[in-house]
């Protein structure tokens, strides 16, 4: 059937130039599944529309199974404290198409899920971060390979002048890098660690393994952007984390209580 519609009104597929799909829609499980599968080349995402409108703006995009929101918020705070016109959008902050009064100097920090990236065709980021990958959302993606591919759309669409910051100790990230050639400059968080700077950070929030890892990503971005280290240190010292995500709710010499109830 080449027609879709509700009630008595039918619309032919020829009337569509583009289909902007919501991230929550799985084309394999929806009422329009047959129609959408026939028209995959016409499907775009909100990230694609966003990129088409703000192609010249600097974009830093974070994805991964865990730690996306926290890392995005730290990076947003860091850039804001450095007096940048920075916007926090995507899965955290405002929807990507809701920002107003955007100028050429506006920087976007974007949290992107696998759902948002899966069908994207145009979107690309100047700096991409893949924090980690572990089996998740397989009810949607069906296989771990498809889930990894959705995450790596972020890197696949980048050019040689872009940066991909990756945790190459992660099994799935390492395997993907070894099996394909990607264009951007790959920066491994395990390499060239600024231990002298790390020693200056006196914030118990970064004592957990996950947050130590997130911190390494922040430092790599800071190096690429040549951020002021004194300002960076001040921001990191005062960061308290997001609620329910490795949130320290009590701390003493003998006991630390962490609320990580957001963890899935």
Language-model-derived ranges and their functions:
Residues 85, 204-264:
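Nucleotide phosphate-binding/pyrophosphate-handling subdomain across enzymes
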Residues 36-40, 46-90:
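Walker A (P-loop) phosphate-binding motif
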